[in-house]
């Protein structure tokens, strides 16, 4: 999953990309239909002077297919 996410974020030219799989913390939780729980950190000069919410929306937009396909259930984004 890390590579799938990283490849979709290449257009942001990230200087820093960190990925953490938190799925093991959510095993058996109600509403979890099998998609993973992840945390990511993305630092890019393209985000300079961009509000936090807009940065997060940009990142989520690039990963939308992974959400739609059920591969990501929850994602914590720091950008």
Which role does the model predict for each range below?
Residues 1-79:
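N-terminal, polar/charged subdomain of small-to-medium soluble alpha/beta proteins
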